[in-house]
């Protein structure tokens, strides 16, 4: 669906109690993350797997008359939690994203490549970030993260 559509925005707001995020942003509350993926795509992220089928069917019903596709991609994604004061330096090793605090902050969301893997990431708090990648790349990406985080190869920059 076109995310600027008023009906779409009302449906999302009513269901999740969150505004549809603007370009390159993420909206959050204690239950959900709504991430801007493209002009016609948002990603809903929840930690409660039991809610996924309910969310999917409710959104499909509410958007019935709109051109919209609602998919559950949870089985094909992995989320890594990276904690510590050097997460910006770590991600800068493999991503072209400007990670200076003035450009990437608590409501920022980016899709990019990290270590040759398609990823998306967002801040949870100042010293923690979530990185989402495809399930099939999780082992490679974990090894890349471990290698990039080696204490002998990381210096404070940000």
Residue ranges and their predicted role:
Residues 1-158:
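Basic, glycine/lysine-rich polyanion-binding surfaces/domains
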């Amino acid at each position: 669906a076109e995310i600027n559509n008023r009906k779409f925005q009302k449906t999302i707001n009513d269901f999740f109690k969150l505004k549809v995020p603007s370009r390159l942003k993420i909206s959050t509350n204690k239950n959900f993350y709504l991430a801007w993926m493209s002009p016609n795509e948002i990603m809903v992220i929840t930690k409660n797997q039991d809610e996924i089928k309910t969310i999917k069917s409710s959104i499909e019903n509410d958007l019935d008359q709109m051109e919209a596709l609602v998919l559950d991609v949870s089985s094909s994604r992995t989320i890594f939690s990276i904690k510590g004061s050097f997460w910006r330096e770590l991600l800068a090793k493999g991503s072209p994203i400007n990670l200076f605090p003035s450009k990437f902050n608590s409501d920022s969301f980016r899709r990019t490549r990290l270590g040759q893997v398609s990823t998306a990431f967002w801040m949870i708090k100042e010293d923690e970030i979530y990185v989402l990648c495809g399930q099939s790349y999780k082992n490679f990406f974990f090894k890349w993260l471990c290698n990039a985080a080696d204490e002998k190869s990381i210096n404070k920059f940000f």
